Swiss-Prot record:
PANTHER family: 3-DEOXY-MANNO-OCTULOSONATE CYTIDYLYLTRANSFERASE, 3-DEOXY-MANNO-OCTULOSONATE CYTIDYLYLTRANSFERASE, MITOCHONDRIAL. Its EC number is 2.7.7.38. GO terms for molecular function: 3-deoxy-manno-octulosonate cytidylyltransferase activity. It is an enzyme of class 2 (transferase). Coiled coil: none annotated. The gene is kdsB. It is found in: Cytoplasm. SUPFAM superfamilies: Nucleotide-diphospho-sugar transferases. The lineage of its organism: Bacteria, Pseudomonadati, Pseudomonadota, Gammaproteobacteria, Enterobacterales. It catalyses: 3-deoxy-alpha-D-manno-oct-2-ulosonate + CTP = CMP-3-deoxy-beta-D-manno-octulosonate + diphosphate. GO terms for cellular component: cytosol. One of its GO terms (biological process) is lipopolysaccharide biosynthetic process. InterPro entries: Cytidylyl_trans, KdsB, Nucleotide-diphossugar_trans. Keywords: Cytoplasm, Lipopolysaccharide biosynthesis, Nucleotidyltransferase, Transferase. It comes from Serratia proteamaculans (strain 568). This is 3-deoxy-manno-octulosonate cytidylyltransferase.
Length: 249
């Protein structure tokens, strides 16, 4: 099965300026991500960036770059620009690999592409079991519930499904029904072309979750439990140091 990995690498970052170029043992972070994407078996890996310094670093490592505008509101919009630039066919499978996840397991990059290929959805993503009460009730941990066929019913920052009987007794025992959504997506190129024509939805604006736009307009999102536990992305200097320590170890 063939798929293309696209890595949006926006230079500006409020908490960690120049994040894609952050050094991790002699290599920019974006190059680590690119190498992980290659290990997934992607037929092509493209870094989409708005900054020439990022482009130069990727090219120096033998990577492919697509320069994009700096005014995109989301990674999906940046993805759409790349799709139009290359003129990818509507049925081409594209995996959006976050540019700030240098430890992403290659197996889940391939998994989400394969899941999309085997489904009727225009988009696929992954989730992992929630194992702690702290995470279960943390609004920064996005929860997802699916139907019997593995298609998303809803994504929320709230604790869903709400286990009424269990939580009435104690919120320390959360059971095994909760799943946390992780931010890796596969799309068919034609779906991305449609997506960027839709106006933002009310639910998306309330929850601040872009994927709710898809459900609002009646489209399907395939969701499966990830084969490997993803790592936390790099948003701060502390996150960056943890990644450096992990790779060194």
């Amino acid at each position: 099965m063939s798929f293309i990995a696209i890595i949006p690498a926006r230079y500006a970052s409020t908490r960690l300026p120049g994040k894609p170029l952050a050094d991790i043992h002699g290599k920019p972070m974006v190059v680590h991500v690119m190498e992980r994407a290659r290990e997934s078996g992607a037929s092509r890996v493209i870094v989409a960036t708005d900054h020439p310094a990022v482009a130069e670093a990727v090219k120096a490592a033998g990577g492919e770059v697509c320069m994009t505008r700096a005014d995109h509101n989301s990674g999906t919009e940046r993805l759409a620009e790349v799709i139009e630039h290359y003129g990818f066919a509507d049925d081409e499978i594209i995996v959006n690999v976050q540019g700030d996840e240098p430890l992403i397991p290659p197996v889940i990059v391939r998994q989400v592409a394969e899941n999309l290929a085997g489904s009727q959805a225009g988009m696929a993503t992954l989730a992992v079991p929630i194992e702690s009460a702290e995470e279960a009730f943390n609004p920064n941990a996005v929860k997802v519930v699916m139907d019997a066929q593995g298609y998303a019913l809803y994504f929320s920052r709230a604790t869903i499904p709400w286990d009424r009987e269990r939580f009435a007794q104690s919120k320390e025992s959360i059971g095994d029904s909760l799943l946390r959504h992780i931010g890796i997506y596969a799309y068919r190129a034609g779906f991305v072309r449609r997506y960027v024509t839709w106006a933002p939805s009310q639910l998306e604006q309330i929850e601040l979750l872009e994927q709710l736009r898809v459900l609002w307009y009646g489209e399907k999102i395939h969701v499966a439990v990830a084969k490997a536990m993803p790592t936390v992305g790099v948003d701060t200097q502390e996150d960056l140091q943890r990644v450096r320590d992990s790779i060194k170890g």
